[in-house]
Design a protein with these regions (language model features):
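Enzymes that bind and transform nitrogen-containing heteroaromatic metabolites
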Residues: 1-185
């Protein structure tokens, strides 16, 4: 593939860097209207949206976006009725991107943890990290697997070659801010 990809992650986390509760689902305490609107506008601009299986199932594709679902149950890269499905253990990202985005484009990766870990290794160009202050989810699912071991999300992003480049007071009345991390040049 000769054209450039722009890979962007999107997550809202609790104070303890969690994206989901004990049940694996995003709790109401992490849902914020202004964050949701920002996120939906970002997805509308994307040429491809990459979800994990659970995130794909939890977020119906009512807008008809082009989706890629990461799952060990897929055979390489396969087209199903609801989306493209990809098993990274059977086909490389460059091969998938070359097939689905031969001219390059914007890739949105909104999770979950498996997708975030995968694209941290592949290389995010940006990561839009919203935080819902005052929310804690003990025992919940962390944004990155390294956060499960106590590594702060900011350290994970910095170790992944990103730097904090922008702070957005997304919804101060509800304690939600966004930090945009971009690839260090």
């Amino acid at each position: 593939m000769s054209q450039r990809l722009d890979i962007r992650g999107y997550a809202i986390v609790s104070d303890d860097d969690k994206i989901a509760g004990l049940d694996g689902l995003t709790p109401a305490s992490l849902r914020n209207e202004k964050d949701w609107d920002y996120y939906q506008r970002a997805l509308d601009r994307a040429d491809l949206i990459v979800f994990g299986r659970r995130s794909h199932e939890a977020e119906p594709n009512v807008r008809g976006h082009r989706r890629l679902v990461v799952s060990r149950e897929a055979a390489g890269l396969e087209r199903r009725t609801d989306a493209w499905w990809w098993n990274p253990g059977e086909m490389s990202w460059p091969d998938v991107a070359g097939r689905l985005l031969p001219s390059g484009g914007l890739v949105a990766a909104p999770g979950g943890q498996v997708v975030f870990d995968l694209f941290l290794k592949i290389g995010f160009d940006e990561f839009h990290l919203s935080r819902a202050h005052g929310v804690r989810l003990p025992g919940g699912r962390a944004v990155f697997s390294a956060c499960e071991a106590g590594v702060p999300v900011e350290s994970v992003l910095a170790q992944g070659g990103l730097r904090l480049s922008e702070r957005i007071a997304l919804d101060p009345a509800h304690g939600v801010e966004m930090n945009v991390w971009r690839r260090a040049l």
